[in-house]
């Protein structure tokens, strides 16, 4: 594409916008709060009016935290509901491609630079084999890159964050039992997301006979990492361990010998604590398949906008991003 393209990463809490040229570099990136706008069209118009420098893009590539099934988009953890066609027309785009947000993250992993990846154990990746991608944010995103015989890659659009969460210890079983009194289905996302950390904290508090005095993941994380609140500390530790369980299950399901990449808005902000946590031990703790998983490398993506890196692939080389 010779002209600038509008790219967007639309999650449950924030929508990130930028302009992108054929070199794949994001220009004028801006983060807007979804709650401040009635939908993507008003947010896009605000971005273009205030931050685009007079550029009127004709094409768009959006990553959205939603199932992509036809024209209608309903974000999983946001009140935004919109039509792709109507949005395209409302903001004056001639072309608009929309993919799942973690599909875009999956498309990014082969293009990330070493400085945007933090190793969290394991061996070396095996070339040409499946790659797993997951990460907690407002929800729990899950995707994968699957290679073809011709050397091209397909990014899977999945709803793997809604698989049933399994306990690996008696304490986790009690925590999940407690959460089942609140939710008909305790999915992985119910514990591995921003609200999921709050859910874990509340369950741990109840089981420990303490009052749950905190209500935001940021405060729980801070109090857990600095050790000032034992309940918060246990909630964060359980969060890391359950991430290992889910990531290990995903690696086994995919045969992800190409590696496991972890993204999302939560873990990069506590990267060192995550690296030193029980995540990797739990990732490998799958009985007879411990040696199999021990060889699979895991990385934390520290790039601030990995979805934009993936969208750049769609913009510059849509056939084999």
Curated annotation (Swiss-Prot):
**UniProt cross-references to Pfam families, sorted A to Z:** Glucokinase
Which of UniProt's keywords are assigned here?
Answer: ATP-binding, Cytoplasm, Glycolysis, Kinase, Nucleotide-binding, Transferase
Q: Where in the cell is it found?
A: Cytoplasm
Please provide, alphabetically and separated by semicolons, the GO molecular function terms listed in this UniProt record: ATP binding; D-glucose binding; glucokinase activity
**Binding positions (ATP):** 8-13
Question: Which InterPro entries does its entry note?
Answer: ATPase_NBD, Bacterial_glucokinase, Glucokinase
Gene3D superfamilies attached here?
A: 3.30.420.40, 3.40.367.20
A GO cellular component annotation in the UniProt record? cytosol
Q: Which GO terms describe its biological process?
A: glycolytic process
Q: What is its EC number?
A: 2.7.1.2
Q: Which reaction does it catalyse?
A: D-glucose + ATP = D-glucose 6-phosphate + ADP + H(+)
What protein family does this chain belong to? Belongs to the bacterial glucokinase family.
Q: What is this protein called?
A: Glucokinase
According to its UniProt entry, this protein's organism is: Paramagnetospirillum magneticum (strain ATCC 700264 / AMB-1)
